[in-house]
Each structure stands twice: as structure tokens, then as C-alpha cells.
Amino acid sequence: MTADQAIVIDNGSYQVKFGLASEVRPRVALNALAKDKYGVTHLSNQVQNIKDISSVVFRRPHELGQLTSWELESCIWDYCLYNPDEFGIDWQSLENRHVVLSETCMTLPELSKNTDQVLFEEYEVDSLYKAPTAAYIPFYTTNENIKTISGKSDHGELDIEEKIEAGKEYNDFSLVIDSGFNCTWVIPIVKGVPYYKAVKKLDVGGRFLNGLLKETISFRHYNVMDESILVNNIKEQCLYVDPVSYFEAFKAKGKNKIDFVLPDFQTSFQGYVRDPKTALPDNAQILTLTDERFSVPEAFFHPEISQSLKPGIIETVLESIYMLPELLRPLMASNIVCMGGNFNLPGFTDRLVSELQRQLPTDWVCRAKISSGDKSLTGWTAMAKFAHTDAYKKARVTKEDYFEHGLDWTTKERFGYQNWV
């Protein structure tokens, strides 16, 4: 690796995605520390080696979406960056490297300062650029692996070639919906900058779905309140969002039932979806899921089913749109970009576009762009594209700038959101 290549790190609250800007796909590591029921601690991807996944307790560097524990985060980063046996890279250190980093939207200034201090003084990077993941998305929407879903198309899914003015490296306007582990952000991007006055946050994310799924299964089937890994596996393999409506899914719940084989710690340690053509092992325990498959993700649209008296994702997006200048509103509604691991749920984007189209004025068209691959990698891909632009080279903060102007300057003048509010 040459020293002038940027190292791109999408530091999410669930996973760390990292790699060189020149690479096609990032390496992925769990952003957590786990302790099993025998008291043994497992760092990041070592969790995959746990044989008995019951009663595993997690500790994460992020709390309420904010990076609060650099003591733990630095251990996870060291595991990721200096681990050639697992990730096939040997960077030795970040000293004199260029780093492109993501951070939570609306990061508290003091916590943002901690990040700057750790990167420049502990890791001794040569330069740093950091921003909310959504701020990189305008550089991603020219990717050939994007599909566009329209609320007014008979076919629903369209292949639209993006046309950008000559000499421009990004799209001017995007309404980014980032649905991750901790929450869901709705962030309008105008001329490459988040329009913070219209940024909205919905406290429903992957962690929320896990908790609701735990309660639902524990009430109807088995007690799984201490089975965090198992419930997360069930969520990723079994849940979906009906692309039309909850009522359509409920009418067809008998046809869409699924059997999940619980781990027996002999033939399976994680559990799996049963193939009807395959014989079951002796003494196998089956968890049959019917309406749980779609009623749990329905909390995105109707949080009241989980006793949460908050607006759903449709109301949150509409509120963000109507806080924009009037001329931008229809433009943003037709330039939605969906990203984050929750959009891996089948049917989520289709349902979102369908519901939004019903709520918007009739002469508006709702369109959403989404990756055809793993949606949780969208942010890293956008960051890698940004790292090749001239805008990045002009905007990054060098080590000399940091030590000349100080910590407060980097937060207030370069990376903080306060100047844009």
C-alpha cells in the first residue's frame, strides 16, 4: 500500500467497515465486545467463535448513537487494522496515513473532539476528513449497482441512468434515509452539505427490532430474552416488510409462515431456516413464525404497535421535507437515497416509496435509489468514491493544521455541525 492512499473507515454503531479507497469491498468487523456465560470475553469478530451463544452480553463503544468510549473503540480498531491473519492486511500503524472517517450526525462537540484527538495524537494520522455518512452519499449515486424505485411507475422498479453535469463530481440534492442499528436518520443534503434544520431522527433501528422480536417470541413461543445473537439471526434471516400494506401481509400470513430450527449445539450453533425438502435432525426444536415475520418491522411505520407514542418513518420523512425551502421539496422527494442495514429487509424500500407517494401532493413523484447489494456497505462505498475527488484533498485537515490551530478549531470550523445550523 502506498502512503498516499486514503484509509476509509465507516465506524458504525454495529459494524466497522474499513479498507483502502481503491478497494471494491471493505472488510467488516463487529463493533462490540462480548462476554459469554462462562465469563470469557470476545472482541469484535471473535464473537463468531462462540459455541454456546446463549446469555451472551454485549458492550458497545456507542451509546444512543454517540461514540462515548474510545477506550473500547481503540481496542476494536487495533484488532481490525493490525490483524493480518484475519483480514489479510498489515498496515503496521496509521502514522502518516490519510483517513476518511464517518461519524454520527449531530455528534456532541466534546465527543467529536475526542475523535480528533485520538486520530491525530494517538494514531498520528497525516490527515483526517470526517462527516456523517449521509454527507458522502452524493458521490455514490452515480454507481452502476443502484436501482431506482418510483412511486408512480407501473413496474415499481426502474433502471435510470444518472446524468450529472460535466465537471461535477456529485449530485446536488439528495434526501438520505440512513436506517442503522441505533436509529434511523433522515438527512437532506444540499450542494454536498447536510441541511441541519431539516434533519430528523427516528428512534427505531436494528436494536429496537431485536428487542421487539425478543418480546414477541418470548410471549408466544420460547423465552429468548437473553438470546441476543439468536434473535439477531432470526431477524436477518426471517423478517420482511410487505411491499403493499400490513393488511395484505396479514391476509397471506398462512402462506408465508416459516420454520426456524433452533441451535442444538451439535449440528448447528446459530440456527437456520428449515428447508422443507431436508430431513430434520433428531430432537430438533422448531420455531414457527407467521405474522411475527412482518409485524415486527411494521414498527417502522406504526411504532404504536410497540407501545411507542412517536411518529413513524413516513411522518418523519414528511416532516423533514416540509422543513426545507418550498422549491426544494418536490426535488428532494424524487431524490431519496436509502442506506443502512435495515434496508436489507425485503420489501422495505418498496413499501416506503409506496406509502410516501400516497402522502405527497399528486403532482410530485417519489423516487428512491438503493444499492442492489448489501445496503449496509453503501456508506463505505460512497466514502471510497469521495476519497478520489479533488474536493476531498481540499477539505481534509492535515496534521500541521491540527497542531497549528488546535482542537477547538477542527470541531468548530471544519468538522462541527454548529456552523451550518
UniProtKB/Swiss-Prot annotation:
Signal peptide: none annotated. Gene3D superfamilies: 3.30.420.40, Actin, Chain A, domain 4. Coiled coil: none annotated. Keywords: Activator, Chromatin regulator, Cytoplasm, Cytoskeleton, Nucleus, Transcription, Transcription regulation. GO terms for molecular function: nucleosome binding. SMART domains: ACTIN. It is found in: Cytoplasm; Cytoplasm, Cytoskeleton; Nucleus. Component of the SWR1 chromatin remodeling complex. This is Actin-like protein ARP6.
